[in-house]
């Protein structure tokens, strides 16, 4: 049952990782769009 447990963890981490990357890219885009240094 350890394989099922690890599979559940991976399925739970994938959306969180994608959401984190999306938020980071969005914040960098907003920061670059607001201040033109």
From Swiss-Prot:
Name of one Pfam family that matches: PetG
Keywords carried by this UniProt record: Chloroplast, Electron transport, Membrane, Photosynthesis, Plastid, Thylakoid, Transmembrane, Transmembrane helix, Transport
Membrane topology listed for this record: Single-pass membrane protein
Subcellular location: Plastid, Chloroplast thylakoid membrane
GO BP: cytochrome complex assembly; photosynthesis
GO cellular component, one term: chloroplast thylakoid membrane
GO molecular function, one term: electron transporter, transferring electrons within cytochrome b6/f complex of photosystem II activity
Annotated family: Belongs to the PetG family.
Subunit structure as annotated in this protein's UniProt entry: The 4 large subunits of the cytochrome b6-f complex are cytochrome b6, subunit IV (17 kDa polypeptide, PetD), cytochrome f and the Rieske protein, while the 4 small subunits are PetG, PetL, PetM and PetN. The complex functions as a dimer.
Protein name from the UniProt record: Cytochrome b6-f complex subunit 5
Lineage, top ranks: Eukaryota, Viridiplantae, Streptophyta, Embryophyta, Tracheophyta
């Amino acid at each position: 049952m350890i394989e099922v447990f690890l599979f559940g963890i991976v399925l739970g981490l994938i959306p969180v990782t994608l959401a984190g990357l999306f938020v980071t890219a969005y914040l960098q885009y907003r920061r670059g769009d607001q201040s033109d240094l």
